[in-house]
């Protein structure tokens, strides 16, 4: 399967920045033989405009409310995203879990609302430093994954991407080894095989995220269980985004 590179812009970039990004992207990508899929998680205020500016790049949201509509001030529903031509969203990022009281239950509700409507759910899971040091990484990640996928059918699993982001590695420069990540994802796949068919689990796209850059990406991409990367600050620069797309296609 092709590698998938997702740039998560978080709360960065203005409209002019997005235009500049596309100009730089076009300049760099023309020198690359592209053999990877790629998308950008854009701040919600710019989704509509970014879709037009970033032609050729899939644009996704960074969060989506699970209700179709309602009195939820400040939120954007999956149906509003779909109405704007956005067919996917990051869900359950650790920053949402830590700062905005996202729970396993709301992650599950959001995941279901997206996949039921044929939209892509990029579900983030990952352990804290304390959990990592206590050798609880697998238990935490499996528990989050299992809860996120509760009531997701095998047919709907094709619209799910799991992004494993150890919280202790996000923006810190600390990274686990490729083998550590590969072994953990293999264990998660083994458990998922008890709930879904082997073929469905093998087809599930699983990304690594957490201080990914052009120096360490190859180590992750060569692992059999890692199908790409969810990348934050490094991919704010178009040149870097293209570097990872190129590495993902090798």
UniProtKB/Swiss-Prot annotation:
InterPro entries: Aldolase_TIM, TIM_sf, TrioseP_Isoase_bac/euk, Triosephosphate_isomerase, Triosephosphate_isomerase_AS
Record-level GO BP terms: gluconeogenesis; glyceraldehyde-3-phosphate biosynthetic process; glycerol catabolic process; glycolytic process
Catalytic reactions on record: D-glyceraldehyde 3-phosphate = dihydroxyacetone phosphate
Binding site for substrate: 8-10, 171, 211
A GO MF term: triose-phosphate isomerase activity
Localization terms from the record: Cytoplasm
Key words, A-Z: Cytoplasm, Gluconeogenesis, Glycolysis, Isomerase
Domain of life: Bacteria
EC code: 5.3.1.1
Subunit-level organization: Homodimer.
Function text: Involved in the gluconeogenesis. Catalyzes stereospecifically the conversion of dihydroxyacetone phosphate (DHAP) to D-glyceraldehyde-3-phosphate (G3P).
Designated name of the protein: Triosephosphate isomerase
Organism the protein comes from: Malacoplasma penetrans (strain HF-2)
């Amino acid at each position: 399967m092709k590698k998938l590179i997702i740039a998560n812009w978080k709360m960065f970039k203005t409209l002019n920045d997005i235009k500049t990004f596309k100009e730089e992207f076009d300049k760099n990508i023309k020198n690359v033989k592209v053999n990877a899929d790629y998308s950008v998680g854009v701040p919600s205020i710019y989704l509509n405009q970014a879709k037009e500016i970033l032609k050729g790049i899939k644009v996704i949201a960074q969060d989506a409310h699970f209700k179709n509509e309602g009195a939820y001030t400040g939120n954007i529903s999956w149906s509003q995203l779909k109405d704007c031509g956005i067919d996917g969203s990051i869900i359950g990022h650790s920053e949402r879990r830590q700062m905005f009281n996202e729970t396993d239950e709301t992650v599950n509700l959001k995941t279901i609302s997206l996949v039921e409507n044929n939209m892509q759910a990029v579900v983030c899971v990952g352990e804290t430093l304390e959990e990592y040091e206590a050798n609880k990484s697998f238990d935490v990640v499996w528990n989050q994954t299992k809860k996120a996928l509760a009531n997701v059918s095998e047919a709907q699993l094709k619209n799910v991407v799991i992004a494993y982001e150890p919280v202790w590695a996000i923006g810190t420069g600390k990274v686990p080894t490729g083998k550590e990540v590969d072994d953990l994802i293999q264990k998660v796949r083994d458990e998922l095989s008890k709930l879904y068919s082997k073929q469905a689990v093998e087809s599930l796209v699983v990304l690594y995220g957490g201080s990914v850059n052009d120096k360490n990406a190859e180590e992750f991409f060569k692992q059999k269980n890692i199908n790409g990367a969810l990348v934050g600050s490094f991919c704010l620069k178009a040149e870097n985004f293209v570097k990872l797309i190129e590495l993902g296609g090798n």
